[in-house]
């Protein structure tokens, strides 16, 4: 099933163009229900957790978590998306270059609770912003080019602090009917990408088919949420 999308490639410029043209059907104006439902499982009794949002867009989930006392670091290629996040949430923000990543900028709210890096995700590393106690991956693994998934998994694992709890949202559908993105990521691939380094637990599986996906030609869509934690070192 994976071979149907194996060679599909989206250039970074195409994602930036989608923001320029406001073709952002993937953006959700409300906090994602899967995050709200599984929040306690991720926080696990901790307060002031550092959260990482790969390919963050202007997700309102980031403000929600900051308002709950956590801090958020996101990475996004589109400067427009980052500016819209701060403007639409009425946050004053600063803008600085990132010496460790040529051409990158970091935008931060005045409270310092939200820091968004404008750069290629694969230019980012723990050397730039440390490791994280939580990760919310909605629209990231399913958006990167399928051929980059091994590299992506290695990056994400390198960003996980020992106590990190990684909430991963994936989509199941018939890839013969739609070429993506968002791409089809079966549970077996989650296991093959992360299983050697992480314990993987399926938390939730829901029917997520809407008229938007029907317009893509799909007749079924399942959304799965997994919780990944680093395996104890031997």
Language-model segments: what does each one mean?
Residues 48-50:
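Nucleotide donor/acceptor-binding cores
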Residues 143-155:
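A short, conserved alpha-helix within the catalytic core of class I
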